A protein has these predicted regions:
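Extracytoplasmic catalytic/substrate-binding loops of multi-pass membrane glycan-assembly enzymes
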Residues: 60-75, 84-107, 116-128, 333-337, ...
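Membrane-interface anchor segments at the N-terminal boundary of transmembrane helices
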Residues: 1-16, 269, 346-374
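Alpha-helical transmembrane segments and terminal signal-anchor/GPI-anchor hydrophobic tails
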Residues: 232-362
Length: 374
């Protein structure tokens, strides 16, 4: 499968797509930089993502000899071929009608079977990727670059938003959002992280323009709905983790808009209650869609199962253990400090067992030093 997923044409077309997309980015930068000097970072950030997408492809093709991004593209090819054979079935599958009848059409067309068919979250990436098969000329690296290109819009919006909220820190935000190696590496390939990170950025941007500084409401409501839908469809726990933070953000700005301290004290509790009510309403509305993350008990159980899976012997030294989870809220809270440390700053240098992990450890060491400095 690895040998069939790419040809010499991939490496011939990659520079062509790189140049075309970069020139398009330079064109956008040239048009908008006069109105917003922050666009001076636009083309460079795009170039970083495009190069990262190529690097990710090479690493998964030649170092790991496989990976989800290859599986997603492989399955998306089947879906794209179905477009020419039976457009009705293709569009049904595109809108997530993964029925036995539709699968049988793939089988009877010698396209059996797309991977991840039974995994709704993973198959969402396959469905999205199928839209890029024709524009990429059925080219793995080119499709990855198009994925990176489309995802960049939300990321750059987050960069603009943070600079609006905290002016004078554009270089630091550029490093953190546009140039950080792990961010562009895992956010520039045909992967769940590419879509969910971009959606999280778009959701942050749209919430700001809906609730905090209302602007172009129809467009931003549509963006918020689409971003939320994709987050829930791919990684619902991100939406669950995002919701409290967004609620606090909205409540904080609403309270701070009240200039009189006395009125702020009087009205503040009502705004807080309204915010909690809104978060509760949204959580209950999406409860069924959140599945294993639709309640605290389900989320804890999912965390225990995932943790036990990731510490299996099959992973060897490529994982680290934060200790036993007993499935209780108290037990989860007791692991909070070590889990945060592991999530933000591991692997440490002494955890590295291969070149890729060493690169990640070097970046994490830099982040830890910056954290301690601040």
């Amino acid at each position: 499968m690895i040998k069939e997923i790419y040809t010499e044409l991939d490496f011939l077309l990659a520079p062509v797509y790189l140049v075309l997309i970069y020139l398009f980015a330079k064109s956008i930068q040239g048009k908008r930089i006069k109105d917003n000097p922050l666009y001076s970072y636009y083309a460079r950030g795009m170039l970083f993502k495009l190069v990262a997408s190529i690097v990710v492809c090479i690493i998964f093709l030649y170092y790991y000899r496989g990976g989800d991004n290859i599986g997603y593209f492989w399955s998306a090819e089947f879906c794209a071929k179905m477009m020419t054979l039976n457009p009705k079935v293709y569009f049904a599958v595109l809108f997530n009608e993964r029925t036995h009848e539709n699968l049988s059409v793939f089988y009877n067309s010698n396209l059996c079977c797309p991977d991840y068919w039974k995994d709704s979250q993973s198959f969402t990436i396959v469905r999205i990727c199928s839209l890029f098969i024709w524009p990429s000329l059925n080219n793995f690296i080119a499709a990855s670059m198009l994925f990176a290109w489309i995802s960049y819009g939300g990321i750059f919006r987050l960069f603009l938003l943070f600079n609006k909220l905290f002016p004078g820190m554009e270089k630091k935000f550029a490093i953190a959002i546009l140039y950080m190696p792990s961010v562009i590496f895992w956010g520039s390939a045909i992967l769940k992280d590419t879509v969910t990170f971009s959606c999280a950025c778009w959701l942050t941007w749209s919430v700001y323009n809906i609730f905090i500084v209302p602007n172009n409401l129809r467009t931003n409501i549509l963006i918020a709905v689409v971003a939320s839908f994709l987050l829930i469809s791919i990684k619902p726990y991100i939406f669950v983790a995002f919701l409290p933070g967004l609620t606090l953000w909205i409540v904080y700005f609403r309270i701070m808009k009240i200039k009189t301290a006395f009125i702020r004290i009087l009205v503040g509790p009502a705004i807080i209650i309204t915010g909690i009510g809104l978060a509760t309403f949204l959580f209950s509305t999406f409860n069924e869609s959140l599945g294993e993350y639709g309640s605290v008990d389900k989320a804890i159980n999912k965390a225990v199962v995932t943790k036990n899976d990731l510490t299996r012997e099959a992973y060897g030294k490529n994982s680290f253990d934060i200790g036993q989870l007993d499935g209780s809220v108290g037990g989860m809270l007791s692991k909070f400090p070590v889990a945060v440390m592991a999530g933000l700053f591991r692997p440490f240098l002494w955890d590295a067992t291969n070149p890729v992990m060493l690169f990640s450890a070097l970046e994490n060491s830099f982040l830890l030093l910056m954290f301690l400095k601040v």
